[in-house]
Amino acid sequence: MAKAATIKIKLLSSADTGVFYVTKKNSRTKTDKIVLKKYDPVVRKHVEFRETKIK
């Protein structure tokens, strides 16, 4: 059985509020860490969310 190409990742807020989004990415084509600007409802602003592993 082959290994799955897509993995689930957690996007954690860089504002240290504990807010996170869960998404998936293709680990074979996207080898670098994902950084996206998304909305953080705690600080009520758009901030950078960085990829971390789901534990």
Curated annotation (Swiss-Prot):
<dbReference type="InterPro" id="IPR001705">
    <property type="entry name" value="Ribosomal_bL33"/>
</dbReference>
<keyword id="KW-0689">Ribosomal protein</keyword>
<dbReference type="GO" id="GO:0006412">
    <property type="term" value="P:translation"/>
</dbReference>
<dbReference type="Pfam" id="PF00471">
    <property type="entry name" value="Ribosomal_L33"/>
</dbReference>
<dbReference type="GO" id="GO:0022625">
    <property type="term" value="C:cytosolic large ribosomal subunit"/>
</dbReference>
<protein>
    <recommendedName>
        <fullName>Large ribosomal subunit protein bL33</fullName>
    </recommendedName>
</protein>
<dbReference type="GO" id="GO:0003735">
    <property type="term" value="F:structural constituent of ribosome"/>
</dbReference>
<dbReference type="InterPro" id="IPR018264">
    <property type="entry name" value="Ribosomal_bL33_CS"/>
</dbReference>
<dbReference type="InterPro" id="IPR038584">
    <property type="entry name" value="Ribosomal_bL33_sf"/>
</dbReference>
<dbReference type="InterPro" id="IPR011332">
    <property type="entry name" value="Ribosomal_zn-bd"/>
</dbReference>
<keyword id="KW-0687">Ribonucleoprotein</keyword>
<comment type="similarity">
    <text>Belongs to the bacterial ribosomal protein bL33 family.</text>
</comment>
